């Protein structure tokens, strides 16, 4: 099926702005905006049904290899043409690539994930920095984490700044929002908390030799750390030792170190 290039209307441009700016619109319609030629092309190749429509600048196809133009126009997805200046105003990129897409939010089955014999997940506790969260999603996807659960009052993972920082990883990692730590405990998960404070209740991460079969690693924000509710729910609290005088790591860096180390450990059931 071949797509035709349509001129975008003012009403539809207004709708795109709403999707970009408001979580309420994204939640109601279960969509978000994806920017950049590379992530759009990758999504067309892997999951074309996720795309609602594509918006390009008038000269976009002239700058692309023939195979990219053919892929977009043969996708069956509605393709709109939008003036360069308007598209640049919509874009969250420093330099607009000349293409953005409205995309269906992915849906995941939490029960299927938790039914696996080994669960290695991540819990983000009230994380607010979009770039940090995007990097965490990208890292977790790369390290084959089972899923990411986000606490209430965390930033929306479909915020354009988060989406940009994920570098296309949003469709590779199951994500569940508005999740309390108590709900994960009730599902039989063990919480391992990354604590910013060294105390008698913490151990250095290098001392951990095994992990439970159903482990959730909890990461808090750099400024506040983990909430008391999460710390109290944790079976184990660990620290990432740093050189004296060095400030605490940001959430994305702490998550990367913790996930890399812990994901390579055997499970306790495997050694019993």
Label for each model-derived stretch:
Residues 1-68, 154-156:
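Boundary-proximal intrinsically disordered activation/regulatory segments immediately upstream
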Residues 192-246:
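Active-site/ligand-binding-proximal alpha/beta "capping" segment
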Residues 74, 85, 106-201:
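RNA substrate-binding interface of SAM-dependent RNA methyltransferases
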Residues 70-92, 176:
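A glycine-rich helix N-cap at a beta->alpha junction
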Residues 63-75, 230:
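Short, aromatic/basic amphipathic alpha-helical patches
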Residues 99-101, 139-143, 152-171, 228-272:
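Structured adenosyl-cofactor binding patch, chiefly the S-adenosyl-L-methionine
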Residues 36, 128-136, 249-254:
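Amphipathic alpha-helical repeat scaffolds
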